[in-house]
């Protein structure tokens, strides 16, 4: 069961599920950093700059603290992004979807979002044509506990996706992050490659870059991922931009871009808690194809 504390700061409502200590570290002060005086989670490295008036949803577990964070737009009934991190502590594997759910449907409404603004299982089941319930923070990135895994199935972490996209290039991108031995994909989430991966993903819900389903769900025209790798004090970033269409590509090279370019396309200020001088260099750099294994 999730425990929620409803807190308001400025115009930003913040919602917590469960408890636990936050292991985020506040970066040096800079002009575009989030204000973390009241909510220290805002200073986490994976956090983008928060859009004024948005609802911030923080899901936590007792064992691992912050599981993931969502920016939710009440007016659109849609999430703008989910951000999370991968590190040696939260990357331990203690179970699997099949072992935990035994064929049952684990998807559920996100009760940290007020009923008037949340999406529902019926919104998805009555969609015509059909769209998948596409994870933003994937189930496979949260296998450290049943609680953490279950939270990835909350509809606040879900966007409608075409099946040929969800099971195609989006799945391939997910596998490149966490690895997939069955398909012989070596992922980035390993100690040889990273100390920590900071990840922000989502679909476009601004500037009319979306359509709507017959049930009123926002359907993004594009999806994106911003990934920051930290290893031995070295920082490298990768932006990924996907048109939302049936696409079974098994190469990410054509979708890769700098974080600056991804910010231009999405209107989102990624990794805003980095010191400004470091942020400018990291986000302007073009992706290192060899480092990321882009093919």
Give the ranges of each region predicted by the language model:
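Domain-level detector for secreted/extracellular nuclease and nuclease-toxin modules, and
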Residues: 13-295
């Amino acid at each position: 069961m999730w425990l929620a504390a409803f807190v308001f700061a400025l115009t930003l409502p913040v919602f917590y599920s469960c408890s636990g200590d936050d292991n985020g570290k506040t970066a040096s002060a800079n002009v575009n950093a989030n204000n973390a005086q009241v909510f220290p989670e805002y200073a986490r490295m994976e956090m983008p700059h928060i859009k004024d008036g948005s609802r911030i949803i923080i899901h936590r577990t007792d064992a691992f603290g912050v599981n993931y964070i969502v920016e939710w737009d009440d007016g659109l009934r849609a999430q703008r992004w989910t951000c999370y991190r991968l590190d040696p502590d939260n990357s331990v594997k203690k179970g699997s979807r099949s072992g935990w759910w035994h064929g049952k449907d684990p998807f559920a409404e996100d009760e940290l979002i007020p009923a008037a603004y949340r999406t529902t299982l019926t919104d998805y089941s009555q969609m015509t044509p059909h769209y998948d319930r596409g994870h933003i923070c994937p189930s496979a990135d949260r296998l450290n506990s049943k609680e953490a895994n279950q939270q990835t199935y909350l509809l606040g972490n879900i966007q409608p996706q075409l099946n040929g996209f969800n099971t195609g290039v989006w799945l391939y991108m997910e596998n490149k992050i966490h690895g997939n031995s069955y398909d012989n994909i070596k992922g980035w989430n390993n100690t040889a490659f990273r100390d920590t991966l900071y990840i922000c993903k989502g679909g476009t819900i601004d500037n009319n870059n979306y359509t709507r389903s017959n049930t009123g769900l926002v359907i993004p025209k594009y999806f994106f991922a911003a990934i920051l790798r930290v290893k031995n004090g070295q920082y490298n970033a990768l932006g990924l931009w996907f048109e939302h269409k049936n696409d079974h590509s098994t190469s990410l090279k054509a979708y890769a871009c700098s974080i600056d370019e991804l910010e231009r396309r999405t209107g989102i200020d990624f990794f805003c808690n980095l010191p400004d001088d470091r942020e400018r260099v990291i986000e302007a750099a073009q992706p290192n194809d060899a480092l990321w294994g882009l093919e």
